[in-house]
Design a protein with these regions (language model features):
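Conserved helicase motor core of SF1/SF2 NTP-dependent helicases
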Residues: 1-275
């Protein structure tokens, strides 16, 4: 369970919790209760998992649950679309952090463009509009796009609305924290971070195992990771996720076709711009 994210202004409020276990800045509800009662607290592992396709939840099972989960959902035998995909941006450091603008935050326009590329039509033989066909299930979404950063989520939401040829469907672009308790037929995770010095500094937040666990396990049938061209080599969990997808299907780790003349400003840029 992910803990809440607080406004930095609250750090100046000098109200101390009665006990460390009640410190809302350090604990989620689950960790608070565990801290209070310790080993006296009864624990039950809910082993049967019904939400995700087996290929999706197996990553979480091996990475976070010591292989104790039992996948109860079977993949449809007539489903031609890949369950797992990785879509990489072209070479370059595309993350930006706005500090002095009216809108502050961290985002990657190239990853936003890559998501638009995915949901706007046919990519590597996969028609995303067909993947999103069918009926909605309960309160879940047809398409979910999760990201660690608020600004990225907001700009992705705007991108979804501007994709005119998408069918009418239930979609949500939100931070990973806001996706707790929710699910989507197809889930996209945008990591945002790049290989710049600031990107490396932000990796500790983005590569949190609880964050990746929540993001991946929201996907019911399809999961797509959108990340930087170098595959976040300094990460642990994200790198393991990419390796897992590559092991399942090497052909589903691909590079985005989205290019920009501004890529020429980077030391490393796509050779396609020389054509």
């Amino acid at each position: 369970q992910l803990g809440p994210i607080f406004d930095k202004k609250l750090e100046s409020v000098s109200i101390s919790p009665p006990l460390p276990a009640y410190d809302v800045t350090a604990h989620s509800i689950l960790s608070s209760v565990t801290e209070l009662y310790g080993q006296e607290l009864p624990r039950t592992m809910l082993r049967e998992h019904y939400r995700c396709a087996p290929e999706i939840i197996e990553f979480c099972n091996k990475m976070f649950y010591n292989s104790e989960l039992i996948a109860m959902k079977a993949k449809s035998s007539d489903d031609p679309w890949p369950t797992l995909m990785v879509r990489k941006t072209p070479p370059g450091n595309h993350m930006r952090t706005l500090r002095r603008a009216l809108t502050k935050g961290t985002y990657s326009q190239r990853e936003i463009d890559t998501v638009e590329e995915l949901i706007g039509g046919v990519v590597d033989g996969v028609d995303f509009r067909e993947i999103l066909g069918g009926e909605e299930s309960g309160s879940d979404y047809m398409l979910g796009i999760a990201t660690p950063y608020r600004l990225q989520a907001d700009r992705l939401s705007e991108a979804i609305c501007s994709t005119a040829d998408l069918p009418e469907m239930s979609s949500l672009s939100e931070t990973i924290h806001k996706f707790q308790g929710r699910g989507a037929k197809a889930m996209i995770l945008s990591t945002v971070v790049d290989e710049s010095r600031i990107g490396h500094m932000k990796l500790r937040f983005v590569d949190d195992p609880r964050m990746i666990n929540v993001a991946v396990s929201r996907a019911k049938e399809k999961f797509i990771l959108v990340t930087n061209h170098d595959e976040v080599p300094r990460s642990k969990i994200i790198k393991a996720l990419i390796d897992y997808v590559r092991f399942q299907n090497p052909n589903q780790v691909t590079e985005s076709e989205v290019l920009s003349v501004f890529d020429l400003l980077y030391k490393e840029y796509s050779e396609r711009l020389n054509e």
